[in-house]
Swiss-Prot record:
Pfam families documented for this protein: ASCH
Keywords assigned by UniProt, alphabetized: Hydrolase
UniProt GO molecular function: hydrolase activity, acting on carbon-nitrogen (but not peptide) bonds, in linear amidines; N4-acetylcytidine amidohydrolase activity
Active site residues according to the UniProt entry: K21, T24, E74
Top-level enzyme category: hydrolase
Physiological role: Catalyzes the hydrolysis of N(4)-acetylcytidine (ac4C).
Residue ranges annotated for the ASCH domain, each copy included: 6-101
InterPro entries: AC4CH, ASCH_domain, PUA-like_sf
Gene that encodes it: yqfB
UniProt similarity note: Belongs to the N(4)-acetylcytidine amidohydrolase family.
Record's GO cellular component terms: cytosol
Lineage: Bacteria, Pseudomonadati, Pseudomonadota, Gammaproteobacteria, Enterobacterales
Protein's UniProt keywords contain Transmembrane helix: no
Source species of the chain: Escherichia coli O1:K1 / APEC
Protein name per the record: N(4)-acetylcytidine amidohydrolase
Length: 103
């Protein structure tokens, strides 16, 4: 079995598969992904594969510069997005936006 290249919390799986979630915001440890990369995607909880994505763009962002567009691409409100990011990455301010599409 091939290893997964990136994982998402299971709660995001349906939104990814339906095309409602089209970005992910990560910390520096996952800043190496580049436009054009094709990635196997698994669930964080069990590493079970559930789709393949292609990276369509990358950029940097801070918690303070997150926008309504980022929130829309994450399929949540801006307030929810800021809370999720702060919960996952406490005490961090610099993040990496990975835009993607399911293949």
């Amino acid at each position: 079995m091939q290893p997964n290249d990136i994982t998402f919390f299971q709660r995001f799986q349906d939104d990814i598969l339906a095309g409602r979630k089209t970005i992910t915001i990560r910390d520096e440890s996952e800043s190496h992904f580049k436009t054009g990369d094709v990635l196997r995607v698994g669930r964080f909880e069990d590493d079970g594969y559930f789709c393949t994505i292609e990276v369509t763009a990358t950029s940097t962002v801070t918690l303070d510069t997150l926008t309504e567009k980022h929130a829309e691409q994450e399929n949540m409100t801006l307030t929810e997005l800021k809370k999720v990011i702060a919960d996952i990455y406490p005490d961090q301010t610099q993040f990496y936006v990975i835009e993607f599409k399911c293949l």
